[in-house]
Curated annotation (Swiss-Prot):
Organism phylogeny: Eukaryota, Metazoa, Chordata, Craniata, Vertebrata
Function noted in UniProt: Core subunit of the mitochondrial membrane respiratory chain NADH dehydrogenase (Complex I) which catalyzes electron transfer from NADH through the respiratory chain, using ubiquinone as an electron acceptor. Essential for the catalytic activity and assembly of complex I.
Record-linked InterPro entries: NADH_DH_su5_C, NADHpl_OxRdtase_5_subgr, ND/Mrp_TM, NU5C-like, Proton_antipo_N
Protein name: NADH-ubiquinone oxidoreductase chain 5
Gene: MT-ND5
Keywords, ordered alphabetically: Electron transport, Membrane, Mitochondrion, Mitochondrion inner membrane, NAD, Respiratory chain, Translocase, Transmembrane, Transmembrane helix, Transport, Ubiquinone
Bilayer-spanning residue ranges: 4-24, 38-58, 87-107, 114-134, 140-160, 171-191, 210-230, 241-261, 272-292, 301-320, 325-347, 370-390, 407-429, 457-477, 482-502, 537-557, 582-602
């Protein structure tokens, strides 16, 4: 029973020595990146054994707790929960990180600080695993803040570039807003439950208040880039491509969705929280898909596809299916990491060119990268029997059978169609047609550190969904019986988007519009949201803060009230004194009347 718990602990602790060696010997050798990559690969192989044992045993979860500290009101402990979610996620995260680290050996080869880069990647992975295995809110918060600060350091890796620094600060600021919600939920549960353990919180809060649930939703919206707190995700593309791959596949962005999954029992009894989660996820998935349609930066297209898929996961939790959302997290990690690697390979070979309009004809120049990019895009669309199909098709079927919200369902279906459209557009513009890049570009993809990770993730994108779905623990939910036309909804919507993209691509080559329509600008400018929040609102605030003191202090007090008023009175007095006519009797009378008035008052 405790064998797999021991082996999991062994796997997790084996990741710590590479970090400790950097403190003992700061002047590391050039073999350090290979050492870190080998450690992560070994840890992945070790983690397969406890996961297999867990699936074979009828154990629901094992919780290992170590007492840490006791205050007057609460007992803090280091508590690790090894259940279905953590045991399935650990091998996926390790496998993807192993591939990304091997890819980084090629991509970051010329970077003088490559050792520090690998250390940051490893700490990023460890903090995510702390978050996944945590069994109390405080420990989860440590992992939560860990992935936040590591994302800040990695996005701003090329710190000499202004855009990279801005993107890193933007990421940390948007996540700070999400952290407000998390800390609000922490304080509420400490006040009302006197506990941060999920089990005790579920028992004591059978009908929980809306405030902590909104706090969790705000935290998830910040970390998983939901609508309103999403601008940091496309900006994070300023970091190195391996960072983007790790950030978007199995670490930072899925942390928010994982938080909602971990505390799903609290939201199940609150219909308003569920509805808000569903609507937020549905709007996000549509908005991100619309934005991806007109982007020309290959990394930003993949970034918006991540945001769209995260919205789909949040919407799935909103219809009460957290297990399906988790399944989509696991399947999504494979093809999303591979899409970023293929993008990085193309960018690197085309001398840092990221505009898909300046690519084309790469199918013959880079056959393996092109094949993997096509497979990853098809898996993202949800093509049958690729990895993405096993989770995406299930989500759409479940949404079809749900009577919760037809509006949200229709939005999800439209977003699915648009996903197919922008993925097809990316394939057509980058891989097919005539080359549109300079002829002197030195294209060479014959590096083992480039090909091996892409091959591994391609195999994962083909078969991982099949293996994961066959190892899902049996649940008490009865099998659904649905009509054939509903079963084929997801596939038909995907094919519709694919055909639309083909048709639009044909029109683009044949017809040239003089002026793009307003809908194009809405999509291309990301719904004008970054311009409004980052430019217009600060500008208006600055303008008001400048004008208000100017009006109150300079114009009114220093000009109108004091100098001008005094001068006006002086002018009036001088006019009065200068208009004397020499009428002595009248002047004496003017003295006499006040004296008479005073005497009357005295008497």
């Amino acid at each position: 029973m405790t064998m797999y718990a021991t082996m999991t602990t062994l796997a997790l602790t084996s990741l710590i020595p590479p970090i400790l060696t950097t403190f003992i010997n700061p002047n590391k050798k050039s073999s350090y990146p290979h050492y870190v990559k080998s450690i992560v690969a070994s840890t992945f192989i070790i983690s397969l054994f406890p996961t297999t044992m867990f699936l074979c045993l009828d154990q629901e979860a094992i919780i290992s707790s170590w007492h840490w500290a006791t205050t007057q009101t609460i007992q803090l402990s280091l508590s690790f929960k090894l259940d279905y979610f953590s045991m399935m996620f650990i091998p996926v995260a390790l496998f993807v990180t192993w591939s990304i680290m091997e890819f980084s050996l090629w991509y970051m080869n010329s970077d003088p600080n490559i050792n520090q880069f690998f250390k940051y990647l490893l700490i990023f992975l460890i903090t995510m695993l702390i978050l996944v295995t945590a069994n109390n809110l405080f420990q989860l918060f440590i992992g939560w803040e860990g992935v936040g600060i590591m994302s800040f350091l990695l996005i701003g890796w090329w710190y000499a570039r202004t855009d990279a620094n801005t993107a890193a600060v933007q990421a940390i600021l948007y996540n700070r807003i999400g952290d407000i919600g998390f800390i609000l939920a922490l304080a509420w549960f400490l006040l009302h439950s006197n506990s941060w353990d999920p089990q005790q919180m579920s028992l004591l809060n059978t009908n929980p208040n809306l405030i902590p649930l909104l706090g969790f939703l705000l935290a998830a919206a910040g970390k998983s880039a939901q609508l309103g707190l999403h601008p940091w995700l496309p900006s994070a593309m300023e970091g190195p491509t391996p960072v983007s791959a790790l950030l978007h596949s199995s670490t930072m962005v899925v942390a928010g969705v994982f938080l909602l999954i971990r505390f799903r029992h609290l939201a199940e009894n609150n219909s308003l929280a569920q509805t808000l989660t569903l609507c937020l996820g549905a709007i996000t998935t549509l908005f991100a898909a619309v934005c991806a349609l007109t982007q020309n930066d290959i990394k930003k297209i993949v970034a918006f596809s991540t945001s769209s898929q995260l919205g789909l996961m949040v919407a799935t939790i909103g219809i009460g299916q957290p297990h399906l959302a988790f399944l989509h997290i696991c399947t999504h990690a494979f093809f999303k990491a591979m899409l970023f690697m293929c993008s990085g390979s193309i960018i690197h070979n085309l001398n840092n060119e990221q505009d898909i309009r300046k690519m084309g004809g790469l199918l013959k120049a880079m056959p393996l990268t092109s094949t993997s990019l096509a497979i990853g895009s098809l898996a993202l669309m949800g093509m049958p029997f690729l990895t993405g199909f096993y989770s995406k098709d299930l989500i759409i079927e479940t949404a079809n059978m749900s009577h919760t919200n037809a509006w949200a369902l229709s939005i999800i279906l439209i977003a699915t169609s648009l996903t197919s459209a922008y993925s097809t557009r990316m394939i057509l513009l980058t891989l097919t047609g005539q080359p549109r890049f300079p002829t002197f570009a030195n294209i060479n993809e014959n590096y083992s550190t480039l090909l091996n990770p892409i091959k591994r993730l391609t195999i994962g994108s083909l078969f991982a969904g099949f293996f994961i779905t066959n190892n899902i623990l049996p649940t008490s939910v009865p099998q659904m019986t649905i009509p054939l036309y509903l079963k084929l909804t997801a596939l038909s919507i995907t094919l519709l988007g694919l055909l639309t993209a083909l048709d639009l691509n044909y029109l683009t080559n044949k017809l040239k519009m003089k002026h793009p329509p307003h809908t194009f600008y809405f999509s291309n400018m990301l719904g004008f949201y970054p311009n409004i929040t980052h430019r217009t609102i600060p500008y208006l605030g600055l303008l008001m803060s400048q004008n208000l003191p100017l009006l109150l202090l300079d114009l009114i007090w220093l000009e109108k009230l004091l100098p001008k008023t005094i001068s006006q009175h002086q002018i009036s007095a001088s006019i009065t004194t200068s208009t004397q006519k020499g009428l002595i009797k009248l002047y004496f009378l003017s003295f006499f009347f006040p004296l008479l008035l005073i005497l009357l008052l005295i008497t």
